[in-house]
Design a protein with these regions (language model features):
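P-loop NTP-binding core
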Residues: 1-251
Length: 251
């Protein structure tokens, strides 16, 4: 039986922040405009540069801390503490693009995993090794009585409808990876960097990006609520792509 890390909510909540963005709006009861900070509709627990040292310390210490706590469940216990004390619809854990100790901990803490991937062969090759790790995490979680969906789906990003190679690579993913792929793709845009530089969301300054993310959220909710229907839907998509491709070849 694994040891459990007990977190103090009073300590944890001090690291949770509600981010804001600067906008202009008409002052109440006045014709004058003023600059105000408006809160986003979510909270964050931001990372920091010293976090990069944590993974190094974890690797040097092995699978356990000095106190004997198993690292694999550390973020799981942290998330459990947040769930018990705060009312969030969803908790999203963003991880670095590397299968290190922190990413493994985050995978254990997640009820389901979304795999973002650029549209290039090297990124696709990494999906298979990642899937093997995700399958191991899922089996380990179930052995501890923890509900875990494994990989929910692959999300293609930096997508451009103007590049025929992107369409070909999308078809490649559907054909050669048994893992479901979201129909939504996050399109490539310079606005993403502009939003990041100005402390804004990509969707705030790009209407097409907002439509992409709205559609993605709908897909994720559907996949979480009805797994069998989700898998059937993604399979039907591949069958449609395959039929269209065969039709083009015959012509």
């Amino acid at each position: 039986k694994r040891e459990i890390e007990e977190f103090d909510w009073e300590d944890v909540k001090n690291f949770i922040y509600t981010p804001t963005y600067l906008t202009r709006r008409r002052a109440e009861g006045s014709t004058n405009w003023e600059s105000v900070n408006v809160p986003f509709g979510f909270d964050i627990m931001p990372s920091a540069l010293p976090l990069s040292l944590v993974e190094l310390q974890m690797a040097m210490a092995g699978s356990k801390t000095a106190s004997g706590k198993i690292y694999l469940y550390y973020i799981y216990d942290l998330v459990k503490c947040i769930k018990e004390n705060a009312d969030y619809d969803y908790i999203i854990i963003d991880t670095p693009p590397a299968l290190g100790a922190l990413t493994t901990c985050a995978m254990m803490a997640a009820e389901a995993i979304i795999v973002p991937s650029n549209l290039d062969i090297m990124s696709f090759r990494g999906i298979q090794s990642f899937k093997e790790s995700a399958d191991y995490i899922q089996e380990t979680a179930k052995a501890q009585g923890i509900e875990h969906r494994g990989i929910l789906g692959i999300l293609l990003s930096l997508y451009s409808e103007r590049r025929s190679v992107d369409k070909a690579l999308e078809e490649y993913v559907h054909e050669f990876y048994p893992t479901p792929t979201f129909q939504t793709q996050i399109r490539e845009s310079s606005d993403a960097k502009r939003a990041n530089a100005n402390g804004m969301l990509f969707a705030q300054i790009n209407k097409k990006a907002k439509a992409d993310f709205d559609k993605l959220v709908d897909e994720i909710e559907f996949a979480l609520k009805d797994p069998k229907a989700w898998e059937k839907k993604t399979q039907e998509l591949w069958e449609k792509i395959k039929a269209e491709r065969e039709g083009e070849v015959n012509e």
